[in-house]
Amino acid sequence: MYYPGPGDFNWALDTATALMQGRDPYAFEPSSLKVPYPLPVALFGAPFVALPKPLAAAIFFGASSGLLAYGILRSGEPWRLVVFASFPYIYALMFAQWSPLIAASWFFPALAPLLVLVKPNIALPVALNRLTRRGVAFAGGVLLVSLLIYPSWPWRWLEMTGEYARIVPLLTLPFGPITLSSVILGFGNVSPLGYSTRWR
């Protein structure tokens, strides 16, 4: 990875470590560059806390990429593997980001609701199009356990997201809603990956 250390996966490792040590994972001063993840992220970090952080992040990102590649090949459209040569993927690699795993959840829908508990800002659109009873039940169980461990974490987390450095594309692109509506009306309910999103 280009970025020193474990990149974005650091939050999973630090949250899991804090919980295992009986510490409050939200006991720090947030900033625009230091906004925590929801508590369920600890589920992903827990298996790796004993490893050096860069190695843990490399394994996580490699496994996420492998799962995405497997999902693409299983779908019977290997040309989609070109995504691994794209700049968004290279950028995600540099910072050990979650986007390959979220993309993989399109092919493995049971993962999608769980990832909403970790990265709601980008996982929600995938989850809403790929809902399964098993996925919702598993995510609900994880959420329940997280609340039993730390009942007030959702409020603590929301309080600390106020420093998040965000942009709202719809305000920077006034014709965004019109363009999106035209695409939907013109091409039907098609996902960014090219699959129909109609309920069956």
Locations of regions flagged by a protein language model:
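Primarily membrane-embedded glycan-assembly and transfer machineries that use lipid-linked glycans
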Residues: 1-109, 130-200
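Transmembrane helices and adjacent periplasmic/lumenal helix-loop junctions
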Residues: 113-128
